[in-house]
Amino acid sequence: YSPLPDGSRDGTYFLNTYKPETKSIFEAESVAFHEAIPGHHLDRTIAVELEDVPDFQKYVASTAFVEGWGLYSEQLANEMGLYSNDIQQLGRLGNDAWRACRLVLDTGMHGMGWSRDEAIKFFRANSPIEEINANIETDRYIAWPGQACSYKMGQLKIEELRRKAENELGNMFDI
């Protein structure tokens, strides 16, 4: 995804078009803002342009920061008035519920002994995720403990830092 260091190739946003009839379009804008601008594309483009940062920090970043920024970007796009309609807003809110569920699912399965079926049942009851995706995502969380939590935890930390900047800068703060 990241652009090449020498600028010879731009960053690329790959869209999964496999079985489009199974995809929800109500979250399309939320995903695009997460992946492109103001999300990952903006973040990774700026990272490679930094001059006083070691190369390894330009190209390898923590999941909590990178994905936290992606989630933060979904809300930032809302503040900027970029969502085109209420259906896309609903998609953003549904995605937010899904990311919050990750915290509960990961903790439930890896800390509280929840079964896969218990996790899927919770997921389906508390987010708008479709059954097939709930199964796939739950299997991912089983195989990769803590990774999915890092998204929301990163977002929460970025929001905390933003509040601090808003308080310190007052009227000078501007998104």
What name fits each language-model region?
Residues 1-175:
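Long, His/Glu/Asp-enriched segments that create or flank divalent metal/ion-associated functional microenvironments
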